[in-house]
């Protein structure tokens, strides 16, 4: 199995409820290792840039508003098949459809306030990691 890195974010709805430790523990218990982490409060410009792929979607404005409404934890996770494992631990985007024991089933409030974000593939992971971290900030 290949060791890979992925991007993970704990969203404002979760940080406001002091769930950072609980969510990080779920990720680590699944075999993922945090190799970079920082707490940021996204500006509107940063949120627009990070979610630019959704710019033409009807929910874009609401997404930007939400993501700039409070602190987030941006982090790089490392482990065997880290991208797939992170997505499995997060659960379905809609918490109503998420498997029992996943982050979103346990902690999400709604499809919009679903507590976490994770990269969906290797290219996206590389882009999202580079958006928030310099290479020297990632310590494996």
UniProtKB/Swiss-Prot annotation:
List of residues binding ATP: 11, 59, 87, 93, 104, 114
Keywords: ATP-binding, Cytoplasm, Kinase, Magnesium, Metal-binding, Nucleotide metabolism, Nucleotide-binding, Phosphoprotein, Transferase
GO cellular component, one term: cytoplasm
Localization annotation: Cytoplasm
Gene Ontology process terms (BP): CTP biosynthetic process; GTP biosynthetic process; UTP biosynthetic process
Cofactor: Mg(2+)
SUPFAM superfamilies with a match to the protein in the record: Nucleoside diphosphate kinase, NDK
Reaction(s) catalysed (UniProt annotation): a 2'-deoxyribonucleoside 5'-diphosphate + ATP = a 2'-deoxyribonucleoside 5'-triphosphate + ADP; a ribonucleoside 5'-diphosphate + ATP = a ribonucleoside 5'-triphosphate + ADP
Residues at the active site: 117 (pros-phosphohistidine intermediate)
Record-linked SMART domains: NDK
Principal cellular location given in the protein's record: cytoplasm
Catalytic class of the enzyme: transferase
Presence of keyword NADP: no
CDD domains: NDPk_I (cd04413)
One Gene Ontology MF term: ATP binding
Biological role stated in the UniProt entry: Major role in the synthesis of nucleoside triphosphates other than ATP. The ATP gamma phosphate is transferred to the NDP beta phosphate via a ping-pong mechanism, using a phosphorylated active-site intermediate.
Family under the similarity heading: Belongs to the NDK family.
Protein name in the entry: Nucleoside diphosphate kinase
Species annotation: Sinorhizobium fredii (strain NBRC 101917 / NGR234)
Lineage per the UniProt record: Bacteria, Pseudomonadati, Pseudomonadota, Alphaproteobacteria, Hyphomicrobiales
């Amino acid at each position: 199995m290949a060791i890979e890195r992925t991007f993970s974010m704990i969203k404002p709805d979760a940080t406001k409820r002091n769930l950072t430790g609980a969510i990080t523990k779920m990720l680590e218990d699944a075999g993922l290792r945090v190799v970079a982490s920082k707490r940021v409060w996204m500006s509107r410009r940063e949120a627009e840039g990070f979610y630019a792929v959704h710019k033409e979607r009807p929910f874009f404005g609401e997404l930007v508003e939400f993501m700039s409404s409070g602190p987030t934890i941006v982090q790089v996770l490392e482990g065997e098949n880290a991208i797939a494992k992170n997505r499995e631990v997060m659960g379905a985007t809609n918490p109503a459809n998420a498997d029992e024991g996943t982050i979103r089933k346990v902690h999400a409030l709604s499809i919009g306030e679903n507590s976490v974000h994770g990269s969906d593939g290797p290219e996206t992971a590389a882009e999202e990691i580079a958006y928030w971290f310099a290479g020297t900030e990632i310590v494996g």
